[in-house]
From Swiss-Prot:
Lineage, uppermost ranks: Bacteria, Bacillati, Bacillota, Clostridia, Eubacteriales
Gene: der
Top-level taxon: Bacteria
Protein name: GTPase Der
Residue numbers binding GTP 2: 183-190, 230-234, 295-298
Keywords: GTP-binding, Nucleotide-binding, Repeat, Ribosome biogenesis
Amino acid sequence: MGKPIVAIVGRPNVGKSTLFNKLAGKRISIVQDTPGVTRDRVYAEAEWLNYNFTMIDTGGIEPTNDDIIMKQMRRQANIAIETADVIVFIVDGKEGLTAADQEVANMLRKSKKPVVLVVNKIDSLKYEENSWEFYNLGIGDPITISASQALGLGDMLDRVVEHFDRFDADAEEDEYIRIAMIGKPNVGKSSLINKLLGEERLIVSDVAGTTRDAIDSYLETEQGKFILIDTAGLRRKSKVKEEIERYSVIRTYASIEKADVCILMIDAQDGVTEQDEKIIGYAHELNKAIIVLVNKWDLVEKDDKTMEKFKKDLQGSLKFMPYAEYLFISALTGQRTHKILELAKKCYNNYNKRVSTGILNDVISKAILMKEPPIVSLKRMKIYYATQVATKPPKFVFFVNDASASHFSYERYLENQLRNSFDFKGTGIQIEYRQRKE
């Protein structure tokens, strides 16, 4: 199961972006910021009280009249309801309760999702009583904060993480391999999922997933148990194109967060687009298992060298993830679709692989004998030993004399040695240096 997702919801100018940027400013143990496809800051990886989670800023276009504000608030609340596990609902303590606040509160109550009500702009104790009227929303006790002054944020996050304990109960789904199908509209994701579901006799059930538009399909095959996280419902007709694009990004990123294996489907006639690179780049940053699926291969004029040349071109465009697996298919005709789940299982096994410490250090010792670390700033890093500390993704910690003497080229060399020795094809891996005395 992926990390819990926390969405920040509220009408324009209540302080959503201020709060998000305060969190993303590394003032509360933020681990990593990830820009969205639209280059807006959509996601921030966060940690609080040893809980890791993902914050979403559901802000976007700020409407100019009341009718559009209400429509925007409904759409924003829907996005939060669809993608989030916990919702932070921000209201303006200085302006007071509004009709838009009431409408969103009604939607959030019906969602059955945990909601943390936050009254912002309470910059001093004299404004505390301003929060009382928000009890009328009927969604629990309000937490008062000042996002701009970073007051009350700890209490707010304490309330948020209280809802995370229920995620420990998701162990039943751990035996399923979670696959996110990602890619631009019209590339064939829906056709492929229907093909996979139609070919497999042992479908367990289709259940509503984390999004209303998408369906998470549970199925069992000879290869194993799978959950297909369908992002086919990303498209929605709207006059406000940029707004919907942003929400599509949020849905897609939420799918990546929850997945073990990310399958990027591209159109053989279009190749890799800039949007494809950014979306799969996020999966790469999270070190997910990755497959690039080239669809509509039946429409390409080809000879016996076309596929290899096409693959090399793709690898050139996606050179930041040389470990990715590639498969050329036709969702329409079924060409090679029977290989998809088999390849996904292989990538997942590598994503979940654990290496014994003894064998690992034998490999590292030989690697150092073949090529010792370079001198960096008059210092040479000495590696004492290494150990694997996690799976999904595989994470290796190297204990060294001086982590500041590390060099990216040598880290790449060590990664290649690990990949060559233990077959991590199809998955990202992590390497971390920890300093210790000899």
